[in-house]
Amino acid sequence: MDSIVGDAIDEAEAEDMGDESAQVDGAANINRSGTMTDDELKAVLKDLQTNITVVGCGGAGGNTVNRMHEEGIKGAKLVAANTDVQHLVEIGADTKILMGEQKTQGRGAGSLPQVGEEAALESQEEIYDAIEGSDMVFVTAGLGGGTGTGSAPVVAKAARESGALTIAIVTTPFTAEGEVRRTNAEAGLERLRDVSDTVIVVPNDRLLDAVGKLPVRQAFKVSDEVLMRSVKGITELITKPGLVNLDFADVKTVMERGGVAMIGLGESDSESKAQESVKSALRSPLLDVDISGANSALVNVTGGSDMSIEEAEGVVEEIYDRIDPDARIIWGTSVDDELEGMMRTMIVVTGVESPQIYGRNGEAQAHAEERLEDIDYVE
């Protein structure tokens, strides 16, 4: 299909039907007076490795971590944090945290964000231990419910205080989920904006353009898949070698204090796959925003071994033509042998304004800031 959202639908349908190299000495004692051996160079590289942690909060966040575990993502530690022990035991992760055991007895937060927040505060020590030493922390959750909405800001705050670049990637509820969940999502988003460098918002309502005819269960699986692909796309910009490499400093340039961001995902296997993949990303229902006003963009172009630098540059040129000429654009490109004859484009734009994001237009933003301290979760 033309977009990664469509690909995510295929993944959800398929799932529903089925119901390092040797260790070297540390770099500290390396002879730095001249030439270096391969082992010494590897040791330097190891010391410079970016430590990335992904923390999935609540049910949706846990599902994201589980999908990343299934995908075999490289270079990131996976942490699942939940108040529901039954859900937590089914998740594949490097570390699992049962938050608020005394508060909830492992029975969940009952769709109450205040309970999720208190549970996370009870388990702060375990949260700090899980993210210790991280250079970058992704906090992923579905906003509107109890555990994810309440705990994600607590986790993000801990990550930021530890010195990590903190990126939250969250979904907002389908309208059909009701006003209470929407109100709680708004409160959770405001809290996340206060404690994260960048918050990437994936509005579930926009997914309805692609999944409107799917059963509810599969629609939520598509949402989980999009979260996973978003985190994976940014992570592997740093961890996977590419034709045009990005490093942690590049990503930090765009994401540090980036504010609210949105993401576009697209792919194409046509003869004009470079142009079509970027157009698909820019048309993505998730990227419900005029990118001409964005202040920064992070672009990841992935293709098969047949992809040329010229094709990758064509993607970036298309974005340059549409964005503020003063905006900062950082891009990288990598090869995935499974994408022979195909190209995928991921665009993250920061400093955006969109009706899908609570409080982002001028008057609403000012009003939100005035009442921020009064915003609370609805029981």
Curated annotation (Swiss-Prot):
> Its domain of life?
Archaea
Function text: Essential cell division protein that forms a contractile ring structure (Z ring) at the future cell division site. The regulation of the ring assembly controls the timing and the location of cell division. One of the functions of the FtsZ ring is to recruit other cell division proteins to the septum to produce a new cell wall between the dividing cells. Binds GTP and shows GTPase activity, but only at high salt (2 M KCl) concentrations. Involved in division ring assembly directing the assembly, positioning and stabilization of FtsZ2 at the midcell envelope. Plays a role in defining cell shape.
Q: Which sequence ranges form a coiled-coil region, renumbered to this chain?
A: none
The record, for CDD domains, names:
FtsZ_type1
Q: Where does GTP bind?
A: G59, A60, G61, G62, N63, G146, T147, G148, E177, R181, D224
Q: Keywords in alphabetical order, please.
A: Cell cycle, Cell division, Cytoplasm, GTP-binding, Nucleotide-binding, Septation
Gene3D superfamilies, from UniProt?
Answer: Tubulin/FtsZ, GTPase domain
Q: Which GO terms describe its biological process?
A: cell division; FtsZ-dependent cytokinesis; protein polymerization; regulation of cell shape
Family matches, as InterPro entries: Cell_div_FtsZ (IPR000158), Cell_div_FtsZ_CS (IPR020805), FtsZ/CetZ (IPR045061), FtsZ_C (IPR024757), Tub_FtsZ_C (IPR008280), Tubulin/FtsZ_2-layer-sand-dom (IPR018316), Tubulin/FtsZ_GTPase_sf (IPR036525), Tubulin_FtsZ_GTPase (IPR003008)
GO MF entries: GTP binding; GTPase activity
Where does it live in the cell? Cytoplasm
Instruction: Tell me the null mutant phenotype.
Output: Viable, but have fewer colony-forming units compared to wild-type. Cells are very heterogeneously sized and misshapen, and have a notable amount of cellular debris. Defects in cell division. Loss or very weak Z2 ring formation. FtsZ1/FtsZ2 double deletion mutant cells show various division defects, including fragmentation, budding, polar tubulation and fission resulting in DNA-containing particles, which are able to remain viable and propagate without regular cell division.
What family is this protein classified in?
Answer: Belongs to the FtsZ family.
Q: How does it assemble?
A: Homodimer. Polymerizes to form a dynamic ring structure in a strictly GTP-dependent manner. Interacts directly with several other division proteins.
Where is the segment annotated Disordered?
1-25
Q: Name one GO cellular component term.
A: cytoplasm
User: What is the protein name given in its UniProt record?
Assistant: Cell division protein FtsZ 1
Question: Biased-composition ranges for Acidic residues?
Answer: 8-19
